[in-house]
C-alpha cells in the first residue's frame, strides 16, 4: 500500500511531467508506441456495440493519449486524472484538435 508521502511524490511528478504527454519522443514515448495495441484491444472489447452510442470514462487519463482516438471514432469520452496539469494538457491538446472530451 502506498503511503501519503509516496502519493504526494507521485502527484508532484506527474503534475511536473504534464508538458511531456504529447511529445512522442519524450518521457511518455512508450505510451505513444503502444497506443495502437491498446486501441485494438479496446475496440475488440466493444466490437458488438456502436461506439457512437458509448460513453467512455478514462480514469488516469494523463494528457488524453487514449481519449482522443476514442473521441475521433465518435465515443463520448470523459477523462479524469489526479494531476490538474495533466487535465490542462489534455484539454489544450483536444481543443487544438477540435475534439470534445
Give, region by region, the residue ranges found by the protein language model:
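N-terminal, positively charged/glycine-rich alpha-helical extensions of SAM-dependent methyltransferases
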Residues: 1-23
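Flexible, glycine- and charge-enriched loops at secondary-structure boundaries
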Residues: 7, 32, 80
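Conserved alpha-helix/loop element of class I SAM-dependent methyltransferases that forms part
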Residues: 32-52
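Amphipathic, non-transmembrane alpha-helical secondary structure
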Residues: 40-43, 47, 64, 68, ...
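Conserved class I S-adenosyl-L-methionine
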Residues: 52-60
Amino acid at each position: 500500500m502506498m503511503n501519503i508521502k509516496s502519493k504526494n511524490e507521485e502527484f508532484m511528478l506527474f503534475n511536473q511531467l504534464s508538458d511531456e504527454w504529447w511529445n512522442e519522443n519524450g518521457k511518455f514515448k512508450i505510451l505513444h508506441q503502444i497506443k495502437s495495441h491498446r486501441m485494438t484491444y479496446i475496440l475488440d472489447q466493444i466490437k458488438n456495440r456502436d461506439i457512437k452510442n458509448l460513453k467512455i470514462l478514462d480514469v488516469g487519463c494523463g494528457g488524453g493519449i487514449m481519449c482522443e482516438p476514442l473521441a475521433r471514432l465518435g465515443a463520448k469520452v470523459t477523462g479524469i486524472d489526479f494531476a490538474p496539469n495533466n487535465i490542462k494538457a489534455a484539454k489544450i491538446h483536444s481543443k487544438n484538435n477540435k475534439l470534445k472530451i
